[in-house]
């Protein structure tokens, strides 16, 4: 891809995200979302592979539909209340349409079918952008309108996303699809708590972004796109594979790693809100995700394929962790002891 085109797309992505998360007016927020969509399309299709072109078309169709719904819901609200302010969403039909539009943009169940397919057609770095940066503007809109939205509907979306995200990830062999279903499952946790404690949703999203970035960057360094490749990469890059394993266990929410903190805090908050049955259900459903994280961890470090060499480590030029990956790995695995400090900052 032309460096100038890549620079323009990157700047547009940052600008679109900034416009949406800092705006109070629906038209400005919608403009930021459209800039984001137009900026990411060249990055998805840059390989010119048929699968990448297919992923681009799917992404464009779903995002344009969701953006049109957001614009329509804001117009309906403005027509009935005379307000274009994002926080003044009072019309019930507008609230319902906005919830559907954000669910499509985020890839929540039952509007999730486009997300794994688009990630599968993208490169690992573009998939990282789709899983993290592109989720930020819709989540910001949800945070700003969370007090107006239907809590029962959000809970239903959250439970179904955690269930389907874990269930459909069980039989996948492509790492990008597994991480796509992981994203859907994590979004379920965020949406579950958004009406009760928005700050906790922000914390969960930040920690999810850190952990997912570590996995994607590590996989991009060792060029792993499927489980069979991950299986044989241990002999070439044991350090990076160990990094992937620890981060995956952190994503699964196992103590004493960072990923345990948001799940623990969400369960605690749900219990305080007298929603113990919901907390129990979402915790049990997260065991499905735990299974495929453990499967990935098993393939990355715990098992070795049949091989003719007597040595576990093949001779290769050492691939060292680059600085961003090293910092993200440290944050992905060691933040749990700092949880009291983080809780006081919420």
Swiss-Prot record:
GO cellular component, one term: respiratory chain complex I
Entries under InterPro entries matching the protein: Complex_I_Subunit_2, NADH_DH_su2_C, NADH_UbQ_OxRdtase_chain2, ND/Mrp_TM
Keywords, in A-Z order: Electron transport, Membrane, Mitochondrion, Mitochondrion inner membrane, NAD, Respiratory chain, Translocase, Transmembrane, Transmembrane helix, Transport, Ubiquinone
Record's keyword annotation contains NAD: yes
Pfam family of the protein (one): NADH_dehy_S2_C
EC number(s) per entry: 7.1.1.2
Molecular functions per Gene Ontology: NADH dehydrogenase (ubiquinone) activity
Catalysed reaction equations from the record: a ubiquinone + NADH + 5 H(+)(in) = a ubiquinol + NAD(+) + 4 H(+)(out)
GO annotation (BP), single: mitochondrial respiratory chain complex I assembly
Major subcellular site: mitochondrion
Superkingdom classification of source: Eukaryota
Cell location: Mitochondrion inner membrane
Membrane-crossing segments per the record: 25-45, 52-72, 95-115, 124-144, 149-169, 178-198, 200-220, 242-262, 274-294, 326-346
Topology term for the membrane: Multi-pass membrane protein
Subunit structure: Core subunit of respiratory chain NADH dehydrogenase (Complex I) which is composed of 45 different subunits.
Listed PANTHER family: NADH-UBIQUINONE OXIDOREDUCTASE CHAIN 2
The family this protein is said to belong to: Belongs to the complex I subunit 2 family.
Its biological purpose: Core subunit of the mitochondrial membrane respiratory chain NADH dehydrogenase (Complex I) which catalyzes electron transfer from NADH through the respiratory chain, using ubiquinone as an electron acceptor. Essential for the catalytic activity and assembly of complex I.
Protein name per UniProt: NADH-ubiquinone oxidoreductase chain 2
Organism: Gallus gallus
